[in-house]
């Protein structure tokens, strides 16, 4: 049984047995976040079905020649870091997931390394106030400016990136 089916079944059973009330669900579920997640997944699925990530990967491989796995990993991590700081971590994941799937299917990177690189890159949101929800949460009340995030986040971004890439390098075959 897949996870979604089990989750829906457990929720329905909890509702039928009176363990879960609809009012509690409405109050405790972040519906805005759920909307963003579902939209991002829909976008990601449409992108994968279009074949664009496979074409982009083929173009990249033809343009760059034979690159090592660590080079592909660094490119993935940097692209995800830029996307997560420019958009948000969820948007970065949704946009780059199809490309990572194409990289895995094309034999460029092993799946574990590729998806960890994507996840860690999407968490590297230290440069802007809108890259991650917590950054935005303290932005206004703390009286910070965007330049403060850039100034304080640049060192963290490089340190975090170095640690992640060194770690992931050991997972490469």
Segments (PLM) and residue ranges:
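Transmembrane helix interruption/hinge and helix-loop junction motifs
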Residues: 1-6, 86-88, 108-111, 173
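Pore- and pathway-forming membrane helices of multi-pass small-molecule/ion transporters and channels
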Residues: 7-17, 118, 122
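Membrane-embedded alpha-helical segments and adjacent helix-loop junctions characteristic
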Residues: 10, 15, 21-106
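Hydrophobic membrane-targeting alpha-helices
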Residues: 16, 46, 103, 162, ...
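Alpha-helical transmembrane segments of multi-pass membrane proteins
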Residues: 69-82, 108-127, 171
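Juxtamembrane and boundary regions of transmembrane helices in multi-pass small-molecule transporters
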Residues: 112, 119-173
């Amino acid at each position: 049984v897949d996870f979604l089916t089990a989750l829906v079944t457990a929720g329905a059973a909890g509702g039928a047995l009176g363990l879960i009330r609809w009012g509690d669900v409405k109050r405790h579920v972040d519906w805005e976040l759920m909307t963003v997640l579902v939209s991002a997944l829909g976008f990601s699925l449409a992108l994968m079905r279009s074949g664009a990530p496979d074409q982009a990967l083929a173009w990249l491989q033809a343009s760059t020649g034979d690159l090592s796995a660590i080079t592909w990993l660094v490119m993935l991590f940097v692209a995800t870091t830029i996307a997560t700081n420019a958009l948000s971590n969820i948007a970065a994941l949704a946009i780059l997931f199809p490309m990572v799937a194409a990289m895995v299917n094309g034999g460029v990177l092993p799946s574990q390394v590729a998806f960890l690189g994507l996840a860690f890159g999407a968490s590297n949101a230290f440069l802007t106030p809108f890259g991650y929800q917590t950054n935005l949460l303290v932005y206004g009340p703390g009286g910070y400016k965007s330049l403060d995030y850039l100034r304080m986040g640049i060192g963290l971004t490089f340190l975090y990136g170095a640690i992640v890439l060194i770690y992931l390098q050991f997972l490469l075959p």
